Structures are given as structure tokens and as C-alpha cells.
Amino acid sequence: MSLPLNINLTIARHVLAERLNGHQRTPLVLMLELTHACNLNCAGCGRIREYADTRAARLTLQQARQAMQAAHTPVVSISGGEPLLHPDVADIVQAALSMGKVVYLCTNALLLEKRLAEFEPHRRFYFNVHLDGPPAVHDRLTGLPGTYQRARAGISAALEAGFGVTTNTTIYKDTPLESILHLFQDLTDLGVDGMMVAPAFAYEVGTNAATLTRPEVEQRMQALYQAWGDRNLYHSPLYMQFLRGERALDCMPWGTVTYNPQGWKQPCYLLTDAHVPSFEALINNTNWEAYGPGRDARCADCMLHSGFEPSVMNGMHSLSDWLQMARWQLGGE
């Protein structure tokens, strides 16, 4: 499926303006981690473990505004931890919308029904709900029975209230294809606006029992494509080809920048070598050439959209790529 036209136009205008201004590294997405506190303890979440000692810290509305102004990205992904635990999350969403941002609020949706009335529907605002499989699979990974049904109820309430809703699903080594198909069918029947997939990534060198190597990702995504196609998937066709091993893409670690109570996360959304005090320090003082597959061993199996979707625009060198993206945007692919 294609992204909404207004979102693609917002991103395209931003990229064009940045290129005309001679900016070499143009982040497209700001991951704004309001807090690392969470009401779940999911097996695959690196954030709540990495920031275990600072979970009580949270960004203020002013800090969030300043980060959005500094990063100057067209898209802001408000996350955590669980952002619906933050008392000012609705005000932060409104601040982002008033700045012209496309906003995704990433949530496990356990508090979505409770806090839904604090938000107003907007064509640039989406709740992005994390679901890793049908009820039995999702509840096992979250460690709390009933989480799937509570999240589903939150999605249903948000859709009925007129909000945009997307989902994000992490695929682990032991995730059966049938469970993903079951989940996708349920979400499609429910009427979500799009579904994202993310291969499970090891945060340190090598993989553990749950994460996937690059060949395993390609095999899984080929099987998913054969069984499901690209129905309702919220990714560009070029990125999906990359996941299936059908094309190469370079990682753009600066394409998605992350700000949280510790500062600007260096170098990227997944890896943490340091936190720096300013966006300028992140962009100008990071040795970007040192990161990515073939450069840093930790990056060898990473295929996450945070680094590779932003490179799609830069990777379109042929007329066929441009035509394929145009067909996708018009709903023809």
C-alpha cells in the first residue's frame, strides 16, 4: 500500500529543500523518547534494559519542543518506554502538529482507551501500536496475559473515534509465518491504516536465540511476500525488496535521530556509543563512515527501516525505480 499523499509530499518537500540548501545529511525522522518507563517488560525490548537506571527520567514539554526544532525533521515518532505514561504526551503531540510535523505515537496501547479523549484526530497524526503476533504469541512476548485483546480494544476505539492507526510487528527467529499471517489478517479486518514489520535485531555483536541474521531475514520476508504480498504494508516497495534480498540499500544512520532524557543518542536508533548534548554535535561530530554493514560488526545483520528506509530516496538512480515508486504512491503496487 502507499503512504498517504500528504505525508509523502511533506517528506519530499523537506528533502528537496534540504538538498537545495546544500545539506549533505538530512534526518527524516526524530525518535522522541519521552520516558523509558514502561508498563510492560517485553522479552525483545532493549530500551527498558539499556535505560534501567534512568527510567524515572522524562522529557519536559519545553525539551520536546526544542528537540523538534533542532532536528527539523518532517516526521516525529513519539516513543519510549511507553509514552502514554507521560502526563504531557497529548500536549507534546499537539506541539508537534502545530509545527507541521507528521506524528506517530508509538504505544503498546494498554492505556489507549483511557487517554484517548485527550487527543484529537488529525490527518498527520497516527497511533502506532506494537503487536508481535496473535493473542498467544503477543501475550507470551509481553509476559502479561490479555495484552493483545487490550491493545486490540484500544485500536478499535481509536479507529471508531476517527484516528489514524498503524501497527509495528517485530519478527523473531521463532515467530511462525502462520502467526504473522493471522495477525495481519486480523489487523486488516479491523481496518488499520498500515502495518510495519521489523526483523529482530541483536544489540551487541552476534545474535542471540531470538534475533535473525541477514540471510534469515531475507528468507522470512520472501516467505511472507509469497503468502501475503504487500497488502497493507506500510513500507516502500524498494525497502521491501531490500528485506527480501532483491536489492542493495546503504544504511543512513543519521536518517533517524533519537533524543531522550539522556540527550542525543549517538550514533543511531539501535546503537548507543554515547549521548551528546546537542543536535549539532550529533550531526557534525559523529564519524558516520564508521557505521553500517561492512564497517561496524554490530551492524552486520541490521536491516531495520530506521536506517534503510531513509536511503530509499537517495538510492533511486534509475527510471524504473522512480516509476515503481510512482505506481506505489498511486496505489498501483
Where are these regions (language model features)?
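Conserved alpha-helical substructure of the radical SAM core
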Residues: 2-118, 122-123, 324-325, 329-333
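Short, acidic/turn-prone active-site loops that include or flank metal/cofactor-
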Residues: 109-110, 131-135
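Residues that line or immediately flank small-molecule/substrate-binding pockets and catalytic motifs
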Residues: 49, 80, 131, 199, ...
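Accessory C-terminal segments flanking Radical SAM cores
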Residues: 226-333
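Generic structural signal for helix capping and beta-alpha/helix-loop junctions
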Residues: 52, 85, 113, 136, ...
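Radical SAM enzyme [4Fe-4S]-AdoMet core and its adjacent flexible, acidic
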Residues: 59-60, 99, 123, 128-132, ...
